């Protein structure tokens, strides 16, 4: 998909001025140039154009609020001065996997006074002797190079991410409290349910016992009735025999 069309789709019924984050990774640039991105994206803070075939940043529009820029896995070898001109507030820049070979190419980044983190993984420049020391000397404003500072301490999350985490933590705590309350209610409900179930089971057992007693009573009554019937039958047979004897005597 062409970059211009991809950007249009990513708007999702928003105006460019409403977009703070834009990701157009793996689309196709036109002749290695940026297209479809305009000055109207004035609120853009995060832009990712990974593996889009860029060779130049010359057509990058003015993005005064842009703080994070992902440009890894492209074919950029220069024109980095555009970044200082168009994205003065940039704090994080990822140029990993590009065609950057010389320290002189990075001199243009000296004017990015707010740049704190720079990634150059898989760029030829990383094979130079004293590469890290040279970058920190060339760009003193940079604190983290390829994820580590000059003392080999790993970069922490950004302040923005920390703020987001704090907010998420507060929300999470509230949600956890609600969850615990619901869980307690569920436990109480479960206990009540167990009592009710136990009670019902006892009732069912009692009903079954009553039914058994009723059946036994019916059987006993049936047995008594059968005994009465048999008694009556024997009585009638005895009377009949008596009558027969009287007739014989006559």
Swiss-Prot record:
Residues 228-238 have a biased composition (Basic and acidic residues). It comes from Danio rerio. GO terms for biological process: chromatin organization; regulation of apoptotic process. Component of a SWR1-like complex. Interacts with H2A.Z/H2AZ1. One of its GO terms (molecular function) is phosphatase inhibitor activity. Residues 194-247 are annotated as: ZID domain. The gene is anp32e. SUPFAM superfamilies: L domain-like. The modification Phosphoserine is found at residue 8. GO terms for cellular component: cytoplasm; nucleus; Swr1 complex. This is Acidic leucine-rich nuclear phosphoprotein 32 family member E. The lineage of its organism: Eukaryota, Metazoa, Chordata, Craniata, Vertebrata. Residues 123-161 form the LRRCT domain. Its main location: cytoplasm. Residues 149-171, 178-191, 205-227, 239-250 have a biased composition (Acidic residues). The H2A.Z-interacting domain (ZID) mediates a direct interaction with H2A.Z/H2AZ1.
